[in-house]
Amino acid sequence: MGQSPDGTTYSDYPSDYILVQGNADLKEGWVCPRVWTTQKTKIAKIGDLIMSVRAPAGTMGKTAYNVVLGRGVAGIKGNEFIFQSLVKMESDGYWKKLAAGSTFDSINLDAVTNAIINVPQNIDEQNSIGNYFNSIDNLITLHQR
């Protein structure tokens, strides 16, 4: 789970660290830089998965950048199979059932770490399945344009 940097460290300078705060920073399954910071708190590396843990909880993205994680997101190490599985869980309403909060819905660390994903033992099989669903996602995106 992320940890927000001090507000005085936020910037508009792309040479600073990209700050991912939540759903607003995830577009079409990818981190879309919008805010920067000079302070590193918790980080995610290129290729990591990013999950929004605040409303709407469960929205997924990938990062093509090294980023700083704010409080509204969690960084997850995983491959395309894990990404596609988490996207499916979100579309099935899994995270919505676990979300709680008085001001806005959010999910906690236990909800994320205790989620059960059936993962094939064979990494090649994981990659094949993940890539297959990624291809379908790309095809759908193409037809929606």
List each model region and its residues.
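Amphipathic alpha-helical segments
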Residues: 116-145
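DNA target-recognition domains and sequence-specific DNA-contacting regions of bacterial/archaeal
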Residues: 1-119
